[in-house]
């Protein structure tokens, strides 16, 4: 199969490109950032010319659904395959989602159930995976062991810089701010079920919108006010608060490395290591950590984030917050360890630091499960099978 891969510097693009080659695809790449994902005329022109110059192309592919790519594919009546790796993904609110040329694959089942009604024949559920063959090829040197060996590591943002709520909380009336903070605190006590959008009323969401500096969506978008408030304001605030509290609690009892570019001034006990390149540093960090921590972003309501597959695919022992879909693919306690509160997490960290044999066996089981069922190669073959059998 010949396809055009529209790359825009998503962290998982290289792994997907590697998998396309391994399964025998002929890939033509359009590799540049998109200034306006909805209407950039230069990008539209460049992609249309690339489609015209490659008459044997069967489809166009991108990470995340991008409306300007959908527009080009509609012009040529060529299938546009997209695989969304983010929640929320605002572009799914675009009216271009309804194009019959789209084949949209979503990794979070609740996200899939929310958006599927807008194009029932063209939106599918597909979990994420990892570039296991590349992770396998990475050997950790003695020098890298000295640099990266640690008891516990977390790689990722604290979400302080991404949390819109922080920039608007002082614009809210006291009663609204109190209600929002109460929702966040209540959500933080519930693992495995995100109820924020369910409990917010339409009236409260509209009032919230009126009080803050709202970032309006493009004209041809559906404006889901409740969804945006729940995910990008309250959901991100939950993520930020949970990560800071969890890392603080861990670092008060254990030796922990944190790889992040976020502000860490509120985390005095953690070993702040700076940023970590996803392809050239993260695999070594995973392989050198006794415990790899996953804390899922709250707007990912049921699905498995990309990070879980990367951690397990690199052979890491993983402790993760509970997500509803995890038991569908991995056996808790055999392939991965799950926690349902900070005290539970601290107890499991202590246990598995003291029980190396169990820790190593669980990491091996998780790796084998990813190798057998959850590689990018297998996921892309599933994707092609779906569109071929339509």
Model-derived regions, located:
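N-terminal pre-catalytic "stem/leader" segment of glycosyltransferase-like enzymes
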Residues: 1-77, 228-232, 255-256, 376, ...
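Short acidic active-site motifs
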Residues: 46, 69, 92, 280-281, ...
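Structural motif
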Residues: 58-59, 79, 291, 317
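Nucleotide-sugar donor-binding catalytic core of glycosyltransferases
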Residues: 4-12, 121-300, 323-326
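Active-site proximal beta-strand in glycosyltransferases
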Residues: 73-88, 103-106, 128, 153
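Catalytic binding pocket for nucleotide-activated donors in carbohydrate/polymer assembly enzymes
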Residues: 4-7, 11-14, 18-23, 28-37, ...
């Amino acid at each position: 199969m010949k396809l055009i891969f529209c790359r825009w510097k998503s962290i998982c693009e290289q792994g997907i490109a590697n998998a396309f080659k391994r399964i025998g695809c002929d890939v033509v790449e359009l590799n540049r950032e998109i200034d306006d994902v909805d209407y950039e005329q230069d990008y539209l022109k460049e992609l249309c010319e690339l489609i015209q110059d490659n008459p044997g192309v069967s489809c166009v592919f991108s990470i995340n659904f991008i409306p300007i790519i959908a527009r080009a594919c509609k012009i040529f009546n060529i299938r546009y395959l997209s695989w969304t790796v983010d929640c929320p993904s605002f572009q799914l609110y675009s009216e271009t989602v309804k194009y019959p040329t789209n084949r949209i694959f979503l990794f979070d089942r609740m996200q899939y159930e929310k958006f599927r009604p807008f194009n029932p024949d063209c939106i599918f559920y597909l979990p994420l995976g990892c570039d296991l063959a590349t992770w396998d090829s990475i050997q950790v040197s003695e020098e890298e062991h000295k640099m990266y060996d640690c008891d516990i590591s977390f790689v990722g943002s604290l979400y302080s810089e991404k949390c819109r709520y922080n920039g608007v909380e002082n614009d809210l009336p006291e009663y609204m701010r109190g209600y929002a903070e109460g929702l966040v605190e209540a959500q933080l006590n519930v693992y495995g079920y995100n109820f924020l959008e369910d409990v917010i009323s339409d009236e409260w969401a509209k009032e919230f919108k009126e009080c803050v500096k709202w970032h309006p969506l493009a004209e041809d978008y559906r404006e889901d006010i409740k969804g945006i408030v729940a995910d990008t304001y309250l959901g991100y605030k939950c993520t930020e608060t949970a990560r800071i509290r969890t890392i603080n609690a861990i670092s008060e009892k254990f030796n922990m490395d944190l790889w992040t570019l976020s502000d860490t001034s509120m985390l005095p006990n953690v070993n702040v290591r700076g940023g970590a390149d996803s392809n050239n540093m993260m695999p070594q960090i995973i392989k050198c950590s006794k415990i790899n921590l996953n804390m899922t972003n709250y707007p990912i309501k049921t699905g498995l984030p990309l990070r879980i597959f990367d951690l397990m695919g690199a052979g890491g022992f993983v402790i993760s917050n509970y997500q509803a879909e995890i038991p569908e693919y991995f056996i808790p306690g055999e392939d991965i360890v799950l926690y349902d509160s900070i005290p539970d997490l601290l107890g499991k960290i202590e246990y598995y630091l003291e029980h190396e044999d169990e820790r190593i066996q669980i990491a091996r089981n998780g790796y084998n499960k990813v190798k057998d069922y959850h590689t990018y190669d297998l996921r892309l073959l599933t994707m092609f099978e779906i569109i071929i059998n339509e």
